[in-house]
Amino acid sequence: MCKRLFLLASLILVLAGAPSVFGEPIGVFNFSQDVGTPGNPSGTGGTRYVATNEYLILAGGSDIWGTADQFHYAYNKVSGNVRFELSPGWDIGGGNYWAKVETMLRVNTDTGSIAYATATRRGDNTDPGNAVVHNWVGAQIRSVTNAGMWGGVEWGGSTPSKIATQRVVDNGYQLVQSLVDYGSGWQNLDTRWVPSLPDQLLLGAAVTSHDNWWLVQARVGNVAYTQNPGLVGIKTIGDPLPVACGDIPGFRIETIKAGEWSDLGGGYAAAEELVTTHAIGGDPGREYGSRIDPVVNLLDNGNFNFGDDTSFPGIDPYEKPVVEPAGGDDDDNYATLVTACIQLTKGLHVIGGHSDDAVKVEIGGVEIGRTVSWNTTDMFVFTAPATGIYSFRAVMYEQGGGSDLELLEALPDGRLILLGDVAAGGSAVYVPEPATIALLGFGGLAMLRVRRKR
């Protein structure tokens, strides 16, 4: 306890006389305040301008995670397209090795506010004097007021030189990006479609000690706000198909269960092997079935976004709507392959879905994304290089427990619809003709495009 009190006193002296009165401008920041109650018992936080684009931020707080919103926040009110960036650093680590420095976008300073952040943490030990930025960076997301803050994409291996969070509206889509710079330019850590955010938001630096008995002091540099930044790292899919695809609306859906001696414990690798060879490690799959549906809204057990589901083919008899569990049993260890041709306009699109356990989506021969968790809906942002018809492929797997699959499209007006729902304004999808599948397959499309370019 004596050591903690000494460290606390030292930190308070470092910021003594600093203009940290809540609401007063401090350098580039117009506001500096504690969020939640991080000052009990550690003491209140503050922000001090020490050099050009460099600040000391003193903070306590139990964490920025789940429903724990306890941190010090130096921020501005922003509108339109804007990026906030900083170089993370620590003067005194203190507290817990999960003490964090973040760039954070919020709706307000209430605990439980909708928030999107790019987070770093200090060194991987509990030495209070440790002042090292750990080689970890992660996106943090709270998309619903008073829900838990959860983790999106995380990277390790290198220490970031800069982090940033930005809001950009492009082609009608409002997007939030978490960005990381390892010294050679910005990289896209995570991109989120956020249709419901207001124009005016809070954007700035957040620091927490992850331990209310300690204060930590972060030293952040290269602090800057940038108006009208461009999107970073958005994938561009391959070329449109060079041949006709089909004129029957819908998707071809194929489901197969793992054999008696195998399972889907290998994740996507096992799922790919099962849907392409109908076996895993030579063990033949069972209960194969296929069907053509206008949309992909499948349920075995445990519904998510949309009702009026249909059962998975093969593993259960046809049901619409499904009475859970479909077929009267809870099926495990199966994979589903969805193929189609999709009509897209040139430019930005947002397509994704939900799956328990997981699904990945490929368009134009390029993987546009994978779901992060069984209990999240993940939408993937990409660009189509031209207006045309593109190959579409999705692979889903289920290991155990509840299971469903929804493929979704976001519209610029903020609506989320089932992919293929043309009546609602969505992109048209078509079942590939057998001749097209035989000629190209969905691994051969990229090969044909290469030959066509030569």
Task: For each feature predicted by the language model, list its residue ranges.
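Beta-strand residues in well-ordered beta-sheet regions across diverse protein folds
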Residues: 58, 85, 177-181, 352-354, ...
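Extracellular/secretory pathway-exposed regions associated with glycan biology
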Residues: 229-350, 354-430
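Extracellular glycan-recognition regions
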Residues: 24-241
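Residue-level detector of conserved catalytic or cofactor/ligand-binding positions
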Residues: 434
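Conserved beta-strand core positions
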Residues: 163-166, 176, 349, 359, ...
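C-terminal cell-surface anchoring/sorting signal
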Residues: 2-22, 437-454
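Active-site micro-motifs of SAM-dependent methyltransferase domains
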Residues: 225, 360, 446
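Residue-level signature for short turns and capping positions that connect secondary-structure elements
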Residues: 62-63, 183, 356, 366, ...
